[in-house]
Amino acid sequence: MTSKQIALILLCFLAINAESHDHQLQQQSAERGSENIISHSCIHDQIIEERKRPGRQVYSVTPQIYGQSGISKPLHRKGRALLGISESSLQQKDVKQPIRIFLNYDAVGHSPDRDCRKVGDIVKLGEPPVASRPGTPCNPHGDPPLYGDCWYNCTVDDISGKDKKHRLRKALGQTGDWFRRALAVEPVKGNLRLSGYSACGQDGGVQLPRGYVEEGVADADLVLLVTTRPTTGNTLAWAVACERDQWGRAVAGHVNVAPRHLTAEAETLLSATLIHEVMHVLGFDPHAFSHFRDDRKRRRSQVTEQLMDEKLGRMVTRVVLPRVVMHSRNHYGAFSENLTGLELEDGGGRGTSGSHWEKRLLMNEIMTGSVDTRSVVSKMTLALLEDSGWYQANYSMADHLDWGRNQGTDFVTSPCNLWKGAYHCNATQLSGCTYNREAEGYCPIVSYTGDLPQWARYFPQANKGGQSSLADYCTYFVAYSDGSCTDTNSARAPDRMLGEVRGSSSRCMASSLVRTGFVRGSMTQGNGCYQHRCVNNSLEVAVDGIWKVCPEAGGPVQFPGFNGELICPAYQELCSTGSVSVPGQCPSSCNFNGDCIDGRCHCFIGFHGHDCSKRFCPGNCNGQGKCLSNGICQCENGYTGIDCSTGNVIFLGEA
């Protein structure tokens, strides 16, 4: 009996008799942490709510100087590291430069009531009453990870030794370098000054060095204060902004990394986690949305919309920012006016709800509520940061997100039980191909101890659904641990009786093939891994070294020496390297300078033409600037924005 058949038998049994935890809309075992953490659960929103307690300040406002020249004296940098140093003091006004992130490690291991310094230490998480010690112990393996007020019992893994500190600096250094390449910002002129009004951050925060307040920090646009305090569950790190400038941009933040995750095994996951958490500091935070600026540098009137979605059967919150919508349309191939925004997460408890993309729609995107080693940064996430008005995004730093690509408007706006192909599976399809055809997979269906929400009931049994609350309990094929068609190292040996071959050119396809003279078993229709190639505008597949041309729209092909047939995918599914022709698409995708709706470009301010390829000075710079030959306004002193219509001394409290 093959491992696939064993897995199917077990799955059938589990589908009937699965035991699970209470249905409090938390993630199930497939997403849970263990001794080998496979994913990071973010608790960002939960931390923000904790900071809203009476008497606590969420952030301070410290105006910075922009658009003026001047050379600053460097600070003594013991225990610090500077990333992305540039001679920005003489840069042209309003020209954005790679963001300079300054990392301060002074607080690592130096908070006796917060840091684990020896085994058996009892330290605080949150603000537990002193009188309760140790009456409210933390559950280090709690799931979901709980950010609360408790006392943590330190183990050897929680102590930041020399090796862990080295890993910390390496990981954060790489994070800072990634953002330096991904984002540009109007550089602070002179030293970046911080208020020092209160401790920066959460969980006791970090007291700002006096020099940061009196002299400022040279060559920096953002200061991150680093700590290594313990966390619970599979939360590897967390981060919050604590100071903003007069435009609302974060200029200081607190990043905490749990020492027990500073290991060689967690290195790749930690890298993705730190990018995720620093994104929260930079602006992917519902509490930062109210400070977002438009191209005129005026406060945005709307960042999100919340409404009752009748098709989904529940309240949803969508980001309606122009570049987010534009890149969403191009990703999903959804050019209908019915796509009005990109949905934010509504599941997963207070830690993830509202501050992440909806996992149902973006799956392994890095800003969903759980991060793993497959997480990628999409153009939609970079677009959100650019739509803040604070940054210019380098979209070449975005990764290729497969999930949902070219699936159309209905994929974004309809319940997942109406999705097509490998994006949806049910109790009668226990085995199939994953959505990208890179692996054979199974359909995990969980029986919960309580009923699921009305909108998540995709089965006659009200307590049955998919394994992830973050993905709205949708059911889709998940790869077998040994089911990869492309990775020969981790996959099981191909079944020669079925004509399978595994390797970089192989993909999963439905098949009933079996060598003549052999019996396939009880499965008349299954799936397997077969080689493919794209030649002469055709998709070809191979079995036993014999190549056959597939029908353009997909369909069955037979091979000599085999009974049964192989079902080819459509040509565009495996062979389209560029954008797929989708109804309503616009010429040149409006050059990404405008939104495409039903085949017509709606250009962003400062652009015009049928494909938004031409620049112009909006309002002729309102008489407060010079219109350059390239169609860009060069504003006079005292004015800013794409059309020089906004005074450049505006504080957070102003409209």
Annotated model-derived regions:
Residues 2-19:
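Cleavable N-terminal signal peptides of Sec/SRP-targeted secreted and luminal proteins
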Residues 18-272, 281-584, 588, 595:
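Extracellular zinc-dependent metalloprotease catalytic-domain scaffold
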Residues 597-598, 603-604, 614:
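Extended, charge-rich low-complexity regions and/or helical-solenoid scaffolds
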Residues 584-593, 617-624:
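Disulfide-braced loops of extracellular cysteine-rich modules
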Residues 604-606, 636-638:
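Extracellular repeat turn/loop positions enriched in glycine and acidic/polar residues, especially those
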Residues 646-655:
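Extracellular EGF-like repeat architecture and associated secretion/anchoring segments
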